[in-house]
């Protein structure tokens, strides 16, 4: 109606109340958490291809061994041509890099040794996939972590941030030291990530 388009995939029952999802705009593929609060479809995403056309969808096994739902799904716009690289966070603080998600996914766990067992709320990607900023949305934990080597080493980037949940993060595309954080107390910014 009025130029809008919608299509339903019937008989699907998956995901959480607000399931994290992200869209690979280069390959026209939507990825979304498939695991429900009840544990159905563990360690899976929903992958929907050809949006706006003859859509094709299905469950996609990730092979991470995770029994909980994914709390964050992030598509990397820096994925090699013709491929989808995803970052998946869990409610238990684990982080995975998934390559080749458009076909047969390959996973690498890049969870930091000191990450809290907490809800991983966002992954921000800098001007390369070596530069990542990860946030957690729990009280009583270090909520902001950064890496400049693709997840081999992680360091706290919380600085003087109070003990508040961080919901989302953005890195400035031309300067990985500049970040915005969406928190329960508003938007915080820094230009001195190290």
PLM segments and residue spans:
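Loop/turn-rich, solvent-exposed surfaces of beta-rich toroidal or solenoidal domains
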Residues: 134-143, 160-192
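Conserved Ser/Thr-centered positions that define the repeating blades of beta-propeller domains
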Residues: 1-2, 21, 33, 41, ...
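Surface loop/turn motifs at the tips and blade-to-blade linkers of beta-strand repeat domains
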Residues: 10-13, 61-67, 112-115, 159-162
């Amino acid at each position: 109606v009025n130029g809008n388009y919608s299509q339903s995939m019937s008989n699907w029952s998956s995901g959480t109340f607000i399931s994290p999802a992200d869209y690979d705009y280069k390959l026209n593929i939507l990825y979304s958490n498939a695991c429900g609060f009840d544990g159905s479809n563990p360690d899976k995403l929903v992958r929907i291809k050809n949006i706006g056309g003859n859509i094709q969808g299905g469950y996609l096994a990730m092979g991470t061994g995770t029994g909980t739902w994914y709390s964050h799904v992030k598509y990397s716009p820096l994925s090699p041509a013709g491929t989808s690289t995803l970052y998946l966070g869990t409610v238990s603080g684990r982080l995975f890099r998934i390559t080749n998600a458009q076909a047969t996914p390959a996973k690498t766990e890049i969870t930091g040794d000191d990450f809290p067992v907490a809800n991983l709320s966002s992954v921000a990607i800098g001007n390369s996939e070596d530069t990542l900023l990860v946030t957690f949305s729990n009280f009583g934990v270090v909520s902001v972590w950064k890496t400049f080597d693709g997840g081999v080493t992680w360091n706290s980037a919380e600085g003087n941030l109070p003990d508040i949940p961080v919901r989302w993060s953005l890195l400035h595309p031309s300067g990985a030291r500049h970040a915005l954080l969406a928190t329960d107390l508003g938007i915080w910014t820094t230009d001195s990530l190290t």
